[in-house]
Amino acid sequence: MQIPSKLKPYYENIAFEQEDSKMIINLGPQHPSAHGNLRLILELDGEQVVKARPCIGYMHRGMEKMAENMIYQEFIPTTDRMDYIAASANNYAYCAAVEKLCGLEIPRRAAVIRMILLELNRIASHLLWLATHALDIGAMSVFLYCFREREYVLDLIEKYCGARLTHSSMRIGGVMLDLPENYLEEMLVFCDKFPNDLKDYEDLLDDNRIWRLRTENVGVVTKEQALNWGCTGVMLRGSGIKYDIRKEEPYLLYNEVEFGVPYATQGDSYARYKVYMQEFRESLKILRQCATLYKDTPPEILATHPEYVSASKEQILTQNYSLMQHFVLITQGLKPPKGEVYVPTESPKGELGFFIHSDGTGRPYRLKARTPSYWHCAFFEEMLVGTYLADVVAIMGNVNIVLGEIDR
């Protein structure tokens, strides 16, 4: 008869030192403030965190391995499920990597439509961040107001692609559809209305004593820490480093529009909140300029390259060669030349990029996603040390992670 061995406590396996004055607790993986299935193992000395370890993997779906068994076009809807709060940002980052691998240049109108989708997506993502972060701290009114405006943004996205969350709105070589009738007019109505809503949020939070106490000098990140831990996006700009990939390595038509790069020097949670609020306004500037750019573009929305992009529906139904080429693309997939490529983009949460290694077949030999939340989550190991347990939830909400792109 086999004698079962006594199981060791979990903390012995992760080399936590045991002292009588210390206590180890689990925050998550099922906890409202974890923003997904995140488990934090915290060692406390009274109320102060002396050691923290993020444990991930509860949402792992093997996306990078799945890509190796899919044709290039087939993987686009899977990218929606990474950062599911900003699906269009994932769609674009992946499509841009494949397009660079193939040497495709997308039409000008497709670039404008992509920019519109990306900036609407950025606003929707930031609104969800502000809503949930405020709710974590106890500001219920802001939560409700943010969701009110977010509904309008999601309605605009739904009017274009038919989906509110998982968009699959882009195609390799361009976009799926042109903008519907009156779309720009509705978007500009939102652009005119939203600044007043932003002022309402700031009136509720900027001088709110509780909000200031819970965010000022809490979760401080120095420049050196931000760089050493690979922080990007607002986590980097909130620490005084004025870096935005849309400015440093412009893609689409970002080099043709005027917008600022908000940043702060304090490095605390309140500074990052102010950067987010200013980013809303910069996105509105970009959307207004995109509405002007769109009117001067020719109507093409997909690149013309039979080897990589299907012809139009009319051509497929009337031309034998287009029908055969479409059949090959759908059954075997496009076949980029051998090589490897990495394309960085500025997603709402930071630098999102895809590395693709092609062996010349219809499926990628290796695909690797560089997601900002993964790096920011790892930073909890240092960022939370020295803080109080009550501030852990506030810091987690402020960092703005999503588990879908951490676990993949």
UniProtKB/Swiss-Prot annotation:
Recorded catalytic activity of this chain's protein = a quinone + NADH + 5 H(+)(in) = a quinol + NAD(+) + 4 H(+)(out)
**Domain of life of the organism in this record?**
Bacteria
Keywords attached to this Swiss-Prot or TrEMBL record, sorted alphabetically, are: Cell inner membrane, Cell membrane, Membrane, NAD, Quinone, Translocase, Transport, Ubiquinone
Q: Where in the cell is it found?
A: Cell inner membrane
Q: Name one GO molecular function term.
A: quinone binding
One of the Pfam families matching this protein, by short name: Complex1_49kDa
Q: Which GO terms describe its cellular component?
A: plasma membrane
| The protein's Enzyme Commission number | 7.1.1.-
Annotated membrane topology = Peripheral membrane protein
Record PANTHER family: NADH DEHYDROGENASE [UBIQUINONE] IRON-SULFUR PROTEIN 2, MITOCHONDRIAL, NADH-UBIQUINONE OXIDOREDUCTASE 49 KDA SUBUNIT
HAMAP family for this protein: NDH1_NuoD
Its family remark reads: Belongs to the complex I 49 kDa subunit family.
Q: Which NCBIfam families does the record match to this protein? A: NuoD, PRK06075.1
- What is the stated purpose of this protein? NDH-1 shuttles electrons from NADH, via FMN and iron-sulfur (Fe-S) centers, to quinones in the respiratory chain. The immediate electron acceptor for the enzyme in this species is believed to be ubiquinone. Couples the redox reaction to proton translocation (for every two electrons transferred, four hydrogen ions are translocated across the cytoplasmic membrane), and thus conserves the redox energy in a proton gradient.
Its subunit composition reads:
NDH-1 is composed of 14 different subunits. Subunits NuoB, C, D, E, F, and G constitute the peripheral sector of the complex.
Q: Which protein is depicted?
A: NADH-quinone oxidoreductase subunit D
Organism source for this protein?
Campylobacter jejuni subsp. jejuni serotype O:6 (strain 81116 / NCTC 11828)
Upper taxonomic lineage: Bacteria, Pseudomonadati, Campylobacterota, Epsilonproteobacteria, Campylobacterales
Q: What is the gene name?
A: nuoD
